[in-house]
Amino acid sequence: MNHSADNTADTNIATGTPVAYAELHCVSNFSFLRGASHPQELVQQAVALGYQGLAITDECSLAGVVRAWQALQDLQQETQKDPSLAAKLENFRLIIGSEFHCDDHIFVVLVTDKKAYSELCRLITTCRRAAEKGTYLFNPGQLFDLQHCLLLWQPQQSFYAQPQQSQQPQQTQQAEFTRRLSHHFAHRLW
């Protein structure tokens, strides 16, 4: 999470108004050896900083979402005592998501509604059932089963490199995958 020195959201220099910001990829301590903070701490900090939203996106898991949601409910109870907190929570949105790794690519799937939530749960279940306990098996082709989710994609570094003669088939496959992904997700891919 980005933290400003005075613990408030960044402001537009020209107008002095707060800039709307939502963290769309944040892992909690439920992503073993990667996330350091408890989901409830992440929610509390995001609200304190004036974020408009926070996506809890643990790796092939929704484990952190329940505690994040509970923390948000607890904060809403405190608004009766703290009107400034009520103002910060008014437009705050907890976003449900999960990240998936494959060949140094990172895919972050975000939920927009109940249908998207169902799709994400199905994807996580499929990936977990295909592997030994504690791991998962994800194939990027599974993304084409998602009709309602949003997708953030961070390709591997070599994806951007100039292809060498021996890498032409791989580059052609990557270009085709990118085209298919862009077509399937249309305005839902970043």
What are these regions (language model features)?
Residues 1-190:
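Phosphodiester-processing cores and adjacent nucleic acid-binding clamps
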